[in-house]
Amino acid sequence: PEPSIVPGPGDEDIGGIEDPTVERLEDGYAVYYTGVLGDHAHGQMFYAEGPSLDRLTKTGVALASSKSEGNTKEATVQRTSDGEWRLFYEYAADDASRVGLATGRSVAGPWTEQPTPFMPREDSWDNWHLSTGPLLMDDPHRPVMFYNGATRDARWRIGWVAFDADCSRVIDRGLMPLVTPPP
């Protein structure tokens, strides 16, 4: 079978497609993905939807990169109890990866950027890079995100951060990583 999302024909994703996130909807699927420009150095988050995963249609940019938040990618989406959606994403700033947050009334947006939900911690295993991961929703009053964190020399680890029920405020964060690479 042919892939349902392919690079091109426009310049905005001709350099490649990566980092898919699939959201099952009542009437089909939504897929967020990173589209890489032809220069292979810049990208942004795109959105596709369709009745099945083999019949997706590209709908355009989900969250554009900006001067302050470059290379938006790696979506984690969650609907909150009030029906609003949260879009966590990775972006580039100051030569590092960060986790951003945007809110929207629909899984397709439009999205309103919010303050950065959590930052690197000085003198810690996650003091430089941060990248989104999946949300564990076993306790809907305390969603937990597993995230990637690293030092400036890119020694990556996996940690966790807990949010309030609406994913709008951090209420706890692990001091030590949950997963570390072998020595």
PLM region descriptions:
Residues 133-134:
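Functionally critical, mid-to-C-terminal surface segments that flank or help form catalytic/ligand
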Residues 1-15, 23-127, 137-183:
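Beta-rich carbohydrate-recognition and catalytic domains
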